[in-house]
Amino acid sequence: MTAPASNITADKNAFFGADLAAADRDIFDRIGLELNRQQNQIELIASENIVSRAVLEAQGSILTNKYAEGYPGKRYYGGCEYVDEIETIAIERAKALFGAGFANVQPHSGSQANQSVFMALLQPGDTFLGMDLAAGGHLTHGSPANQSGKWFKPVSYTVRQQDQLIDYDAVEEVAQASKPKLIIAGGSAYSRQIDFARFRQIADSVGAYLMVDMAHFAGLVAGGVFPSPIPHAHVVTTTTHKTLRGPRGGMVLTNDEAIIKKVNSAVFPGLQGGPLEHVIAAKAVAFGEALQPAFKAYAQAVIDNARALAEALQTQGVNIVSGGTDSHLMLVDLRPKGVTGRDAEHSLERAHMTCNKNGVPFDTASFAVTSGIRLGTPAGTTRGFGAAEFTRVGQLIGEVVNGLAANGVDGNGAVEAKVREEVLALTARFPIYN
């Protein structure tokens, strides 16, 4: 039985005309709650940031309708004229931003960017060398729980116990002993600058490719306040959010034409099908923002604020891994306080400061508990916090942690309530999306 035309017209009008509030109240309400959380909590998770309305608008655009398997000018679908132009803009902006010869902006995430390099340059069972997860590496750098640790043969390097810094001589010793085909520099919880030239020297000495995962510090590189790996690495991977302040996604950069051809084939058709062109458009917008002079000031402020936060924590008797930071993030070692990372994360969240529990070098606690927390300044800097605000944030974190040490998990409610009131006053001074 054919539906009456009037019903079809009504359904069509509702489909194209109803906003989210009218169409799906369950989701609309929960997005509103999440907006309230972001507005009224201080975001200290080092891998998170706050994007512009322009980035949100691009990602929420009608480009979500378009399938575009392949690459600009070489698609497997018709109707790709405009998404070709958008993806080309994203590629050219990425190349200009990082001074790279080639870019692939299609990876859906940093993990898939890393996977694409593995697929492009390694065979299953090949040996590669990466930073141990407990020392600040990443799951995709050889964790046995990750594909990288299941399909390939990972060997790891760590940090020195006395200062928690990379020991490059030790890295070279491991490389000479294991003869990896690929060496990875970069990680998810290492706060110091990395000597990329030394890593390249080590890679060359054993005939290995050097891959730098700059997911965490890409925005600092783009802003000119952190050393660039592009002149030294055979290939560089990154996310496009974190310090780069774009949508959640990944990217691969290189100056080697042979490598980009292999990476392109690995991304599509090797790992992915159709690219997310609405996300690629948002990446292009974020890259355009990062090419503006204001972004350099932002990147410098991120580092200045991180140093202010670390110094404030240290004055509260809180231990910072490696003694400080050169970047946007820091690891807090809570073992001297007798506090776990899990308890600190939960207590700080009740005080409206969001961070994540994190293992510290040579940690004996489980990943579910940990002995530390990881803190970062990108999101707070985006909302306008300066060194004075982050100094106060450090003092407030110290109050919560010291309260936990003195009062225990169940006795810290009064401290959390006091800190929460000050946090709410602080976030009210620096509103977002208002």
From Swiss-Prot:
**Which GO terms are recorded in the biological process aspect for this UniProt protein?**
glycine biosynthetic process from serine; tetrahydrofolate interconversion
The protein's matches in Pfam families, at most eight in alphabetical order, are given as: SHMT
User: What PROSITE patterns does the entry give?
Assistant: SHMT (PS00096)
Record's keyword terms, sorted: Amino-acid biosynthesis, Cytoplasm, One-carbon metabolism, Pyridoxal phosphate, Transferase
Top enzyme class: transferase
Q: Where is this site: Plays an important role in substrate specificity?
A: H241
Q: What is its EC number?
A: 2.1.2.1
Q: Which reaction does it catalyse?
A: (6R)-5,10-methylene-5,6,7,8-tetrahydrofolate + glycine + H2O = (6S)-5,6,7,8-tetrahydrofolate + L-serine
The N6-(pyridoxal phosphate)lysine modification is found at K242
Could you state a single Gene Ontology molecular function term? glycine hydroxymethyltransferase activity
Q: What is the annotated quaternary arrangement, including any partners?
A: Homodimer.
The protein's name is Serine hydroxymethyltransferase
Species annotation: Caulobacter sp. (strain K31)
The major lineage groups are: Bacteria, Pseudomonadati, Pseudomonadota, Alphaproteobacteria, Caulobacterales
Query: What gene name is listed for this protein?
Result: glyA
